[in-house]
Amino acid sequence: MTKKPYFRLSIISCLLISCYVKAETQSIKDTKEAISSEVDTQSTEDSELETISVTAEKVRDRKDNEVTGLGKIIKTSESISREQVLNIRDLTRYDPGISVVEQGRGASSGYSIRGMDRNRVALLVDGLPQTQSYVVQSPLVARSGYSGTGAINEIEYENVKAVEISKGGSSSEYGNGALAGSVTFQSKSAADILEGDKSWGIQTKNAYSSKNKGFTHSLAVAGKQGGFEGLAIYTQRNSIETQVHKDALKGVQSYNRLIAKPENQSAYFVMEDECPKGYDECIPSAKPPAILSTKKETVSVSDYTGANRIKPNPMKYESQSWFLRGGYHFSEQHYIGGIFEFTQQKFDIRDMTFPAYLSPTEKGDLANRPFYPKQDYGAYQHIEDGRGVKYASGLYFDEHHRKQRVGIEYIYENKNKAGIIDKAVLSANQQNIILDSYMRHTHCSLYPNPSKNCRPTLDKPYSYYRSDRNVYKEKHNMLQLNLEKKIQQNWLTHQIVFNLGFDDFTSALQHKDYLTRRVIATADSISDKTGKTRRNGLREYPYLYPKPKPYFAGEDHCNYQGSSSNYRDCKVRLIKGKNYYFAARNNMALGKYVDLGLGIRYDVSRTKANESTISVGKFKNFSWNTGIVIKPTEWLDLSYRLSTGFRNPSFAEMYGWRYGGKNDEVYVGKFKPETSRNQEFGLALKGDFGNIEISHFSNAYRNLIAFAEELSKNGTGKGNYGYHNAQNAKLVGVNITAQLDFNGLWKRIPYGWYATFAYNRVKVKDQKINAGLASVSSYLFDAIQPSRYIIGLGYDHISNTWGVNATFTQSKAKSQNELLGKRALGNNSRDVKSTRKLTRAWHILDVSGYYMANKNIMLRLGIYNLFNYRYVTWEAVRQTAQGAVNQHQNVGNYTRYAASGRNYTLTLEMKF
């Protein structure tokens, strides 16, 4: 298959483009200066300056949707660049209480907020839901891993204008899935690249991160002419796995592996094809039999494979993104345009915790024959599953994600604010996302060099190959209408917003390529001729073996007929549905002392499936929020927020749990939506010194879906294992943020000095299991990030040409109480623990700075973990917990989860 070439943007090409534009810009600038100089020399009289009107696009604010802003964090494209955000893990690096859920195979599974994660935190781009985290049920025996997916598609941050992170139930704003919060992205337009009244603009970004040897190259081009405008952004990224602290790589590691060797015992033999003159002539050169034995080997930490591996699994990451947006302004009020987005990411990993060798604990095949060709002792020695001792094993996971979006939009904006509507936005989008999770286990290249691309062939007896693949597709056809109106009535101001939407969605999971293939080669000894001395395996009377005839064996394990209710089921799991919603919001300013906000949303969702064992139905959800801000003085705000959230069962939960047997034995879930209630109190101090905000929050969750069975009247389980609305929980916590301007505190301190502070703590207050259920575990709050505070101190020169910043992060240890739970077994219960490993407290210091060489070129440098501190984050170790998406099991050494040592990120930005 010929690989299609695609355009690669390099640092050199970006620099060449930028230099050309710089030259053109300088030429125009010189011409303008010459004309200006001539005019100045001709004019000696005073002139009256002309009035200049300056307009700027509104910057996203955390109080846009909800008057209190409690639990809200806004990040703009400028702050994303300033914080050198290159991937999903960088986005919330300095935001305590929000963490990334590791998928376990390089990708991610969304965010964790206030004790909940994955599908309980909504993820949207321009109002479009992104893919759910679809975790596939594992096979009953998954000793070598399986294709479990569970990832989400990742967002390209160079296409993003702003990000809003909302902590606490937010379904009145963002609908299904915003049970514990939401992360929403707003895409860029041409206006975000064009500066002032310029008709064209170019931006380039080239970055390098040492922690994963990652390169980022991005080019954005925008222009406008007449009523037309357009934007094109191309971004390419490539990297490897995040490096562990270098101290962890010192030393060597040892292991024992199976080998084949000759043994002086009574099974001597000769090979027929090695005896051209007959059996009798070969007796003097009879060979001792081959047997399986053990050999100890010592290798570097980087080369070691097995459960005790320290270095992270090697990964190759590639990403490409095209983003196009443009349209035509028919007038100052009317605009129509289109959007096209194509992104793809590839996470290719070799799981080196899986031994490249055959372990002595493997069970040998009793059918092993002692013969071998020439001196190749391991040619036919193998273990029970058919893997030969002379080959190396490699376990590979490929996560390939692809997203394509096509949309049109119409915008009406009445800038003089006269009329019924100030602004209306009508958009229609089609979004297709494909997540391809492919597992391959190869055992067909000579030890110690495994190969991803080798396959069993007849010339490699007891070579072996196994694969498994899950392709998840999610499609949304979405229509959205947003209406805005501002009404000013003396001392009362209304900011009214109406939202209507329709989403036609499809979820399809295809299990495929679930197969095993091996080469078998065996032979029985040739019996002696009548009247001759019997061949008994002694040196004087060795066995005579013919050359084995190899043949292929194996099977396709997939059942495509839909008659299997276990992991072998490869029929497409198809769920279709429609969602309608209406939302309204009114943010009011009652004079200068009170702000009041009210918001409601009503969702109706219907689903259907291609088989009766999938749970479908109709859900009606009403969500709301209210907030009030009382401002008794100019320097004090008292805030209160009350909001709700909901989550309908995920597509994976609707499909249910399959454990074999007939389809009529599969439990079909009967679900209620999960719901949440978020309550927050806030106190804010503000003034020339900056602002300080302290808030206390309480989050109550009801009807959380978990794996369980129903309880019968006699106190035993009914055996209908599956997903049920099983649990309720309540969490409380404190959040503190501060931004201080030292010049505002004391005028003697030079302008530009500032400090920041952030702290978050979450505590489990109550949890219980719903009555009538058995075999259910209480919710393990391993999703809670340990308490963390972040202190920043920085300086920006008054000219904004350079600045420096230092950020100190302190994390507490993971609490054992959050990892302990109860497993209810009828009237009895037992303790369960999420994982054996807890993380200790840790702290690091990061420093960063920027320098503008001129108005077009900026250089940024960040040095992270400046003092090379050795630590492990809970987010990394959580991959070993019970609730992990693809749980790392039988971990022998947790050092592999250690964070990077001192590392740096260098970014060159150019704007013209």
Swiss-Prot record:
Keywords: Cell outer membrane, Membrane, Receptor, Signal, TonB box, Transmembrane, Transmembrane beta strand, Transport, Virulence. Residues 63-188 form the TBDR plug domain. A motif (TonB C-terminal box) lies at residues 895-912. GO terms for cellular component: cell outer membrane. It is found in: Cell outer membrane. It is a multi-pass membrane protein. It comes from the Bacteria. Haemophilus acquires iron by extracting it from serum transferrin (TF) in its human host. Acts as a transferrin receptor and is required for transferrin utilization. Belongs to the TonB-dependent receptor family. This is Transferrin-binding protein A. It comes from Haemophilus influenzae (strain ATCC 51907 / DSM 11121 / KW20 / Rd). The lineage of its organism: Bacteria, Pseudomonadati, Pseudomonadota, Gammaproteobacteria, Pasteurellales.
